[in-house]
């Protein structure tokens, strides 16, 4: 693994310049290895002029891409999946280097990217037509592409988010300009390069940038006809406000403070495994993290004991080390923010039940590590129970009744995921219907189920990704009506009267 990383680093130029990078040296930013704190490379960002160029090129490409048949677009997506598969190891190692996640987790991310292109490539040419017999009128529904679309991506899962936006967008006949997360842009830019070797010119493009300038310019452009953003609730709200000026439709996949509800009759072994997975996978830098565990009071002491023992065994280290469970968070700023939440939890009276041991010596001493942390005796009014921490920190609180559990879950401003664990299926389904979230996982916490709708409610956003309905979100509806010849078409009597000869 170290040899592969060395080859990738050696191949990177000192300054990465892309087609839509500008020449202004002040628009450069450094990409850092979060495991060591050392620079990987410098990226030359774009500016307002290059945004204009990218969108104009995308618009020109749309004029021909939109008329490709669904069968033709299907073949492009399937070919793209094959090409991405060839580069899967390279992409996983690059992602590990710039994001910090364990390379085995990065490999899973790239695998999902490949699968999502295959999924939409396999179904886009098989969607049924819609035809309605209204007596004197026949009516058909045509799903047309929007045009130039924009995808704004975060740093935590570049392959997953890129695939989730690009594949259905292109399958529906749109073109897309992406803006990668500034903390980890290299993997996304490499994915775009690979896709550009498959798709016609300018169908897929990306503009790197630092701060809000590039995304705001992309969203605000009059030629942009749809925007999809994955990020914080604050960034999603700002994007929606900008898009509203031009009445541009948006899909927003935002934050989460996801509850993991455990009743007294739950399978303890399953709960312990899924709780650790849900809380600490991807070092907690996940909108779907099970960061808020709610346990029935009868099971609370036993589960807390098991979770405490498990958290202490989690290994924190370099993602290139295949024995690592939890890598560093993506940046120094994120590290300091997560550590401040841990201190906040202590001040508010939560019990620090367990913490892992981050590396402190050698080349990893400058890394952005946060120890995996378990807080117990957490109440719903505490900051750590309400805020999206976006790091390897999980809280555990108790409840006495089903009604109390539902009320606590629904008190959150977020509404993305929830887990419900009980051997009583009727109760589990009753609770599921009462939870105000977009996705409920019953007796499992498997989040990456391609082919099912992914998305939230409330401050977690709106719109759904990763399923067949996503193709409709990336399309606009045109209704065509024509005479059936079976009976007269109704007409306004006034028109009949005045038009007689």
Swiss-Prot record:
Metabolic or biological pathway, per its Swiss-Prot or TrEMBL entry: Mycotoxin biosynthesis
> Is NAD found in the keyword set?
yes
Top enzyme class, one word, equals oxidoreductase
Q: Which domain of life is it from?
A: Eukaryota
EC numbers listed for it are: 1.2.1.3
Q: Which residues bind NAD(+)?
A: 231-236
Keyword terms, alphabetized: NAD, Oxidoreductase
Q: So where's the catalytic machinery, residue-wise?
A: 253, 287
Annotated GO molecular function terms are: aldehyde dehydrogenase (NAD+) activity
Give the knockout phenotype. Leads to complete absence of citrinin production.
**Which reaction(s) does its UniProt entry say it catalyses?**
an aldehyde + NAD(+) + H2O = a carboxylate + NADH + 2 H(+)
The answer to whether keyword Oxidoreductase applies is yes
Write out the similarity annotation: Belongs to the aldehyde dehydrogenase family.
Task of the protein: Non-reducing polyketide synthase; part of the gene cluster that mediates the biosynthesis of the mycotoxin citrinin, a hepato-nephrotoxic compound to humans due to inhibition of respiration complex III. The pathway begins with the synthesis of a keto-aldehyde intermediate by the citrinin PKS (pksCT also named citS) from successive condensations of 4 malonyl-CoA units, presumably with a simple acetyl-CoA starter unit. Release of the keto-aldehyde intermediate is consistent with the presence of the C-terminal reductive release domain.
> What protein does this entry describe?
Aldehyde dehydrogenase citD
Q: Which organism is it from?
A: Monascus ruber
């Amino acid at each position: 693994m170290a040899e592969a990383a060395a080859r990738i680093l050696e191949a990177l130029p000192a300054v990465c310049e892309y087609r839509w990078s500008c020449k202004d040296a002040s628009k450069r930013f450094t990409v850092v290895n979060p495991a060591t704190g050392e620079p990987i490379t410098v990226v030359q960002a774009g500016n307002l002029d290059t945004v204009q160029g990218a969108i104009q090129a995308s618009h020109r490409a749309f004029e021909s891409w939109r008329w490709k048949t669904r069968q033709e677009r299907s073949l492009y997506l399937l070919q793209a999946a094959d090409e991405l598969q060839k580069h899967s190891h390279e992409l996983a190692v690059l992602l590990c280097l710039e994001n910090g996640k364990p390379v085995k987790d990065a490999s899973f991310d790239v695998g999902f990217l490949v699968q999502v292109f295959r999924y939409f490539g396999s179904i886009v040419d098989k969607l049924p037509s819609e035809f309605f017999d209204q007596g004197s009128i026949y009516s058909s529904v045509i799903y047309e592409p929007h045009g130039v679309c924009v995808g704004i991506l975060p740093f935590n899962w570049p392959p997953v988010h890129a695939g989730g936006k690009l594949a259905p967008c292109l399958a529906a006949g749109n073109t897309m300009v992406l803006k990668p997360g500034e903390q980890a842009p290299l993997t996304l830019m490499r994915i775009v390069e690979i896709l550009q070797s498959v798709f016609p010119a300018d169908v897929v493009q990306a503009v790197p940038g630092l701060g809000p300038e590039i995304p705001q310019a992309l969203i605000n452009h009059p030629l942009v006809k749809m925007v999809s953003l994955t990020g914080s609730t604050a960034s999603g709200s700002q994007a929606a406000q900008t898009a509203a000026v031009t009445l541009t439709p948006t899909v927003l996949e935002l934050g989460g403070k996801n509850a993991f509800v455990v009743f007294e009759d739950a399978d303890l072994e399953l709960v312990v495994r899924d709780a650790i997975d849900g809380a600490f996978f991807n070092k907690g830098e996940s909108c779907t993290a099970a960061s808020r565990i709610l346990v029935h009071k009868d099971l609370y002491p036993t589960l807390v004991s098991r979770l405490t023992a498990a958290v202490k065994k989690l290994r924190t280290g370099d993602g290139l080390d295949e024995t690592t469970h939890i890598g560093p968070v993506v940046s120094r700023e994120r590290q300091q923010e997560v550590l401040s939440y841990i201190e906040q939890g202590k001040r508010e009276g939560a019990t620090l039940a367990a913490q892992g041991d981050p590396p402190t010596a050698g080349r990893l001493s400058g890394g952005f590590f946060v120890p995996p942390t378990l807080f117990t005796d957490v109440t719903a009014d505490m900051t750590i129970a309400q805020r999206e921490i976006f790091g390897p920190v999980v809280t555990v609180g108790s409840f006495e009744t089903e009604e109390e559990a539902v009320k606590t879950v629904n008190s959150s401003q977020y509404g993305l995921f929830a887990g419900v664990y009980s051997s009583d299926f009727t109760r589990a389904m009753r609770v599921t219907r009462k939870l105000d979230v977009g996705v409920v996982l019953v007796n499992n916490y498997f989040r990456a189920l391609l082919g099912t709708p992914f998305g939230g409610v409330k401050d977690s956003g709106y719109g759904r990704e990763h399923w067949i309905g996503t193709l409709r979100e990336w399309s606009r509806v045109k209704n065509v009506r024509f005479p059936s010849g079976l009976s007269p078409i109704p007409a306004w009597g006034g028109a009949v009267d005045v038009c007689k000869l």
